[in-house]
Amino acid sequence: MGAGSVWASGLLLLWLLLLVAGDQDTQDTTATEKGLRMLKSGSGPVRAALAELVALPCFFTLQPRLSSLRDIPRIKWTKVQTASGQRQDLPILVAKDNVVRVAKGWQGRVSLPAYPRHRANATLLLGPLRASDSGLYRCQVVKGIEDEQDLVTLEVTGVVFHYRAARDRYALTFAEAQEACRLSSATIAAPRHLQAAFEDGFDNCDAGWLSDRTVRYPITQSRPGCYGDRSSLPGVRSYGRRDPQELYDVYCFARELGGEVFYVGPARRLTLAGARAQCQRQGAALASVGQLHLAWHEGLDQCDPGWLADGSVRYPIQTPRRRCGGPAPGVRTVYRFANRTGFPAPGARFDAYCFRAHHHTAQHGDSEIPSSGDEGEIVSAEGPPGRELKPSLGEQEVIAPDFQEPLMSSGEGEPPDLTWTQAPEETLGSTPGGPTLASWPSSEKWLFTGAPSSMGVSSPSDMGVDMEATTPLGTQVAPTPTMRRGRFKGLNGRHFQQQGPEDQLPEVAEPSAQPPTLGATANHMRPSAATEASESDQSHSPWAILTNEVDEPGAGSLGSRSLPESLMWSPSLISPSVPSTESTPSPKPGAAEAPSVKSAIPHLPRLPSEPPAPSPGPSEALSAVSLQASSADGSPDFPIVAMLRAPKLWLLPRSTLVPNMTPVPLSPASPLPSWVPEEQAVRPVSLGAEDLETPFQTTIAAPVEASHRSPDADSIEIEGTSSMRATKHPISGPWASLDSSNVTMNPVPSDAGILGTESGVLDLPGSPTSGGQATVEKVLATWLPLPGQGLDPGSQSTPMEAHGVAVSMEPTVALEGGATEGPMEATREVVPSTADATWESESRSAISSTHIAVTMARAQGMPTLTSTSSEGHPEPKGQMVAQESLEPLNTLPSHPWSSLVVPMDEVASVSSGEPTGLWDIPSTLIPVSLGLDESVLNVVAESPSVEGFWEEVASGQEDPTDPCENNPCLHGGTCHTNGTVYGCSCDQGYAGENCEIDIDDCLCSPCENGGTCIDEVNGFICLCLPSYGGSLCEKDTEGCDRGWHKFQGHCYRYFAHRRAWEDAERDCRRRAGHLTSVHSPEEHKFINSFGHENSWIGLNDRTVERDFQWTDNTGLQYENWREKQPDNFFAGGEDCVVMVAHESGRWNDVPCNYNLPYVCKKGTVLCGPPPAVENASLVGVRKIKYNVHATVRYQCDEGFSQHRVATIRCRNNGKWDRPQIMCIKPRRSHRMRRHHHHPHRHHKPRKEHRKHKRHPAEDWEKDEGDFC
């Protein structure tokens, strides 16, 4: 390559480099053309605690240019708020030319610390922070035509709350106050925290400790009893530093939540211990008071009281609404006593608020302790096989929902709820397949809900019956669909939106025969379930087993109370001590062998007069009647649903005792004689069993035909004890038959009491045909007296002395897609008691999307029962606690032993006026809430899609229970009831479902006509405006002149003729008034209602620009300007204010020479004629009435000189000022007159001279009472 080529190549390369450099310079010039550049921060929101200082960053850069040296950047900070769906910027400060102007409301709280030394640093320093400071802030920098901005988000954390000890108000020393805050996940608040909360509107008239050992409280609205050291001014009151041993409340400060607070609202409410257990099952703990306040601060809103870790019951309200504790947002507290002290009793039932930390940390005040609550573990098929249930010691109860109004269930069916009583556990074998419960605590109560199963034998889980296992059972659990807890919409507008945890429904495949255990009290039914059956070949159609067994006493305790000795069972039926026995039925061909079961019956306390009785053998133990149904066509297993009611006790009428009985030989196993009635006609009862064993004499319930009815005998239902042991066999036809040849009756004393129970519901699908019903209409019941307590002649027996009764449920059976071809029944045995008890009931069903028509009819002849319902919230959350007592209606004298035949008639049903409503039952059988009398429950299921209804029909003379009987409304509230639902009308100053919340009486503005309300301890007082009186300022004592309209103590008149502003004001003054002033939104609305044109008002800034004043010299308390007004738009000035009619009367400043209508305003209190003054007269025309603030002037008569002030004013009370003017003749004229008459020397007596020296009495002295 030649030298020329190299040179040319070098020139080409140089040219390319210059070209690139030129392009780069062009790009740099373009980049630097913009002289202002914002350095935006992208670090996320700025977080700071309450009452602290925070710096909101804002940085920008300036590129110096000769053309813009004179352009100085303007910095503006605003807060972005959303109002009416649109963003609005509230100005904070503006900085330019080394001058910083701070907007009103931010003065003393904001600054630019780096300005003006560092003009490019516009960081805003804000503090002490308030909770309302949270939000979005805009930093805007303007230089010439360039505009840059940045947004910064501020989050203020922490909340101040007042804490009161559980025992009383003002009960904490300084050390105890610090500890109370620590247990509430907070610290004791500092004075700056309380001041910041006050500036945000915190108002609480309770003195509390602060961190500097001072005692203070914040008051935004002064009222009697809350003045403190600031009189009637708002502010934080202070008692100064106090002795640490003095007692006050405390103000706590919670800084960070560090987790989530969630509401737990199960279908039935929880005790305090149950709430702890419920939270622990969800991997959380009960929330503390501070955590709930922080959650409320972050937006939690739930109108449902719930337990907290300190034992208090509170709930957070963001949006105030009716029946949620008052008109202001906040965390409400439920107090135990009317004086707003005390936490609810731990046994009371509420919902719960749980806290789950983001990182597992120990929570203050809620340590991990074994639960002793009322909630049992729920068996779930999702868990590992062989899961053991380990309940804590002590009996646990489940309270059924208090169905006092229709329930709206959302979600699917609810999982079973388990309760247990601790007893020795035994591990039993189980049939392979599916999860297995390795051990089950004895006396455990669970609710089974039936579901289709592929197993050969249906378990008690196919029946919606409350059952209680008396011994550990080895059970096979078949997997069932996961169910969710339903949520209810009840009183108080409460709607639960969350769903409970998914739990599994257990199904017990092979219940074994166990000795029964006592399990029922008055209105507290916990029947024992004990069955003995051998399973048929699983290839056959499934069997449905329904067993309701006679109860047997346990260790003499029901719940936490012991039974009286007079209610113990006879040793002739049950031994006080039964050793562990082993019962294994003989298997049938093709049947699976039932597992062996070992059981032990605890000792029963003996009566002092009772002789020792031998322990009976295994054959003497009470067994059960097994109700079996077969399906010959191999149809799948349909659910069996049943509901039971609590037992009720009454006396038989005297005429129902028939002593015509024939004794029969004793059975070797029976220690007592028995009889068989001669006139009893026993028909076969369809019970699916062919051979029955009678280990001792029993009584079997059977239909009885009655040929007469005594006038005293009402229609009642009683039943007999069943002591049969049945074994299953495949049989032909849907129903088996029971041979009554072995049926005998136990002896019954003539004054025996009869214990009845509400009839149950039994739904037994399983037949291929449709339609038809079967009802066991008449049953018998007997019981035996205790030995040693024979009935002496003449003695009386009351229902309280009944020792044992066999109670039957009378089902009306409807088959789902099948016909009922025989009646069925099963018996239970219960013990009456007057002890406080809780009615436990849960009902479940696996019916899918069916509508069930249920008709309930009450039998006659029931005694009056008194029910005292405990206090509580009426929402159907799962509890109904009642204390029942029975009035002894009549007693029967002692007679020899006799059997019992009861005449029966058809139950006469009459409508009770109960509401009838449409019920849609997606998958849950709704528990029935009836009265205290006997009821027969008929269930008719026509098809899976037929709509049904609830209708309650009553017969007899008993009145339904009145929920307002004991007036659950507190503080003088009035209870109103509608059936079983009640509501409270609260007196002034109280709110809440039961009027338990004491609110400010003045919140609802009780004072009328503009009166000022002042809240007091037990009421309020009204300070009335002039011309009003009465306790509520409801009395109008002064009126207005004709053509004027009165409003809140003033008179107003609208003048439609147009005048300039000055002329309008002059005309109003001629009428003893002024152009109207406006001091409240109510007054503005009243004035704006006069006309539909723009009108003058008395506001003006004619004296000082931008200093607006009213012409009546009242203060500027209220403003209602149009947007961007006042603006003083015209160069000549806009000094007068007009109400713009088409913009709802908003104000605008305009020139005063406009001709517009106007409104005059004057007072209602007027003064009479001015007082007369001697030697003086009024200037102008004398009037009959003068307006308040009107002035008059006196002038002296001719020849008299004026001394002192000549004007007086009409005061607000309608009286004139006392005149000060004095009119006196000059002394010179007297001397001249004396000198002129001197030659005559007409001397007068000295006495007359003294008389003339006295000044004459003036007229105004006579009217002394008219002056101030």
Swiss-Prot record:
Signal peptide: 1-22
Compartments where found: Secreted
GO cellular component terms given for this protein: extracellular region; GABA-ergic synapse; glutamatergic synapse; perisynaptic extracellular matrix; plasma membrane
A molecular-function term among this protein's GO annotations: carbohydrate binding
Pfam families in the record: EGF, Lectin_C, Sushi, V-set, Xlink
Alphabetized SUPFAM superfamilies for the sequence: C-type lectin-like, Complement control module/SCR domain, EGF/Laminin, Immunoglobulin
PROSITE patterns found in the cross-reference section: ASX_HYDROXYL (PS00010), C_TYPE_LECTIN_1 (PS00615), C_TYPE_LECTIN_2 (PS50041), EGF_1 (PS00022), EGF_2 (PS01186), EGF_3 (PS50026), EGF_CA (PS01187), IG_LIKE (PS50835)
Gene3D superfamilies in UniProt: Complement Module, domain 1 (2.10.70.10), Immunoglobulins (2.60.40.10), Laminin (2.10.25.10), Mannose-Binding Protein A, subunit A (3.10.100.10)
Modification after translation: O-glycosylated; contains chondroitin sulfate.
Alphabetical GO biological process terms: cell adhesion; modulation of chemical synaptic transmission; regulation of postsynapse organization; regulation of synapse structural plasticity
Annotated Ig-like V-type domain residues: 37-157
Disulfide bonds: C58-C139, C181-C252, C205-C226, C279-C354, C303-C324, C964-C975, C969-C984, C986-C995, C1002-C1013, C1007-C1022, C1024-C1033, C1040-C1051, C1068-C1160, C1136-C1152, C1167-C1210, C1196-C1223
Pro residues: bias regions: 608-617
Record-annotated Link domain positions: 159-254, 258-356
Compositional bias of kind Polar residues: 419-430
Residues annotated as domain Sushi: 1165-1225
Similarity annotation: Belongs to the aggrecan/versican proteoglycan family.
Role description: May modulate neuronal adhesion and neurite growth during development by binding to neural cell adhesion molecules (NG-CAM and N-CAM). Chondroitin sulfate proteoglycan; binds to hyaluronic acid.
Protein name: Neurocan core protein
Organism in which the protein naturally occurs: Mus musculus
